[in-house]
């Protein structure tokens, strides 16, 4: 008896062996570590062990399984999609999630804080650094032409 795993690449061989009247046993494909393997197993309705990598978390979420909120970006995103309360983190992803949830975020001195404040329509003091000049320019404020490169570019 010949044992062949039926895959797209091996289907021609399968038909050739069947034509020769050889007994052929087909087996299902084990869930592979690569993305396409997990997707195929999921489409076939097989149970796939939730992996630690992004694709595993996504599949578990699609199956409706409970996924532990991870500290990494993908964990925060999944928790947000499930409607769970996520503690606002100091890093960019935390500020973004808090902003999407409509929470009040303290305007930070860093670029992301200024961007969020600008999106919320808050008044932001024009800073001397590049991001401050850019925001002031976007708001249509008059910006004094500076001697430095960024000021000249924005004024132009």
Curated annotation (Swiss-Prot):
**Keywords assigned by UniProt?**
Repeat, Signal, Virulence
The record describes its post-translational modification as: VicA1 is processed by several endopeptidases including kexin proteases as well as the cluster-specific peptidases vicP1 and vicP2 to produce 7 identical copies of the hexapeptide Gly-Leu-Lys-Leu-Ala-Phe, that are further modified to yield victorins. After being excised from the precursor peptide, the core peptides are cyclized and modified post-translationally by enzymes encoded within the gene cluster.
- Which residues are assigned to the propeptide feature? 22-36, 43-55, 62-74, 81-93, 100-112, 119-131, 138-150
What the record says about disrupting the gene is: Abolishes the production of victorins.
**Stretch forming the signal peptide:** 1-21
Protein's UniProt keywords contain Iron:
no
- Describe which pathway this protein belongs to, using the record's wording: Mycotoxin biosynthesis
Domain of life, per UniProt, equals Eukaryota
Task: State the function annotated in the UniProt record.
Answer: Ribosomally synthesized cyclic peptide victorin precursor, part of the gene cluster that mediates the biosynthesis of the secondary metabolite victorin, the molecular basis for Victoria blight of oats. The vicA1 translated product contains a 7-fold repeated peptide embedding the hexapeptide Gly-Leu-Lys-Leu-Ala-Phe, that is converted into the cyclic victorin.
Name of the protein in question: Ribosomally synthesized cyclic peptide victorin precursosr vicA1
Gene giving rise to this polypeptide: vicA1
